[in-house]
């Protein structure tokens, strides 16, 4: 298995082991349609770029998106702080999901040979229209060894 496939498989496995995640995809975007078979919360994994910082390392930029569908309560309420939906719950739960995935990659570098960068960038995301969803996008770099290259073969 090449290092790119190993990286995606590692992230997929970590996400699937999270009890809060029901579906893991590699679409490069969240394509939501509640009439499809995807169960939420969903994690989408994609590589947005790569560099070669040295002859022995490949640095890949990873973006993970975790979202859940928003449920709306139609009860009339006078509370202006809390919306009549589960947006806050979705944001809290999906934030913890992306945090757990990133922490596992960050801490288990000796086992996986994948080194996740410190201080990932996080952005809350919200979908409107037919399917309303809430969640987080996290972007971070990972360094992986360029194992297919050898200085002896140059």
Where are the predicted features?
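Small/polar-rich, solvent-exposed N-terminal microdomains that initiate assembly or binding
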Residues: 1-57, 108, 153-154
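Oligomerization/assembly interface segments of phage tail-like spikes and tubes
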Residues: 56-73, 133-146
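A solvent-exposed, charged loop/short amphipathic helix patch at secondary-structure junctions
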Residues: 72-90
């Amino acid at each position: 298995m090449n290092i790119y496939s190993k990286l995606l498989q590692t992230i997929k496995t970590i996400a699937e082991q999270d009890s809060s995640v029901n579906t893991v995809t590699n679409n490069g975007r969240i394509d939501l349609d509640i009439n499809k078979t995807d169960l939420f919360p969903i994690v989408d994994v994609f590589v947005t770029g790569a560099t070669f910082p040295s002859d022995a390392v490949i640095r890949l930029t990873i973006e993970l998106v975790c979202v859940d569908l928003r449920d709306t309560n139609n009860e009339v309420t006078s509370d202006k702080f809390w919306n009549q939906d589960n947006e806050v719950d979705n944001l809290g739960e999906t934030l913890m999901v992306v945090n757990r995935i990133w922490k596992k990659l960050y801490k288990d570098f000796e086992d996986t040979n994948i080194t996740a960068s410190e201080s990932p960038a996080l952005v809350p995301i919200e979908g409107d229209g037919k399917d309303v969803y809430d969640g987080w996008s996290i972007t971070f770099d990972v360094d992986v060894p360029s194992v297919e290259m050898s200085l002896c073969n140059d």
